Amino acid sequence: MNPLISSASVIAAGLAVGLASIGPGVGQGTAAGQAVEGIARQPEAEGKIRGTLLLSLAFMEALTIYGLVVALALLFANPFV
């Protein structure tokens, strides 16, 4: 295996996980903050807000998992070899 391709795959895998987690991390923080603010304003809507928050957090976390899958594919099933 070419060492240049091998090292580029490791760097790309690290970037895939790192960059794939930036957006969802910011989005999850914003969503959680807005949910807490909404619950503080309307405590009677806490159940509905919490359910919507958990669903949206799961969708955001899926983006990070996709980045992890790409990184694992680059490390263990390298298509460039």
Swiss-Prot record:
* Entry-linked InterPro entries: ATP_synth_csu_bac/chlpt, ATP_synth_F0_csu, ATP_synth_F0_csu_DDCD_BS, ATP_synth_F0_csu_sf, ATPase_proteolipid_c-like_dom, F/V-ATP_Csub_sf
Please indicate which residues carry the site annotation Reversibly protonated during proton transport. E61
Q: Which GO terms describe its cellular component?
A: chloroplast thylakoid membrane; proton-transporting ATP synthase complex; proton-transporting two-sector ATPase complex, proton-transporting domain
Q: What SUPFAM superfamilies does this protein's entry cite?
A: F1F0 ATP synthase subunit C
Query: Is RNA-binding there in the keyword field?
Result: no
Compartments annotated for it: namely: Plastid, Chloroplast thylakoid membrane
Its Gene Ontology molecular function terms? Answer: lipid binding; proton-transporting ATP synthase activity, rotational mechanism
Q: Which Pfam families match?
A: ATP-synt_C (PF00137)
Miscellaneous note of the record:
In plastids the F-type ATPase is also known as CF(1)CF(0).
| Function noted in UniProt | F(1)F(0) ATP synthase produces ATP from ADP in the presence of a proton or sodium gradient. F-type ATPases consist of two structural domains, F(1) containing the extramembraneous catalytic core and F(0) containing the membrane proton channel, linked together by a central stalk and a peripheral stalk. During catalysis, ATP synthesis in the catalytic domain of F(1) is coupled via a rotary mechanism of the central stalk subunits to proton translocation.
Q: What is said about its interaction partners and assembly?
A: F-type ATPases have 2 components, F(1) - the catalytic core - and F(0) - the membrane proton channel. F(1) has five subunits: alpha(3), beta(3), gamma(1), delta(1), epsilon(1). F(0) has four main subunits: a(1), b(1), b'(1) and c(10-14). The alpha and beta chains form an alternating ring which encloses part of the gamma chain. F(1) is attached to F(0) by a central stalk formed by the gamma and epsilon chains, while a peripheral stalk is formed by the delta, b and b' chains.
Hey, which family's this protein in?
Belongs to the ATPase C chain family.
What is the protein named?
ATP synthase subunit c, chloroplastic
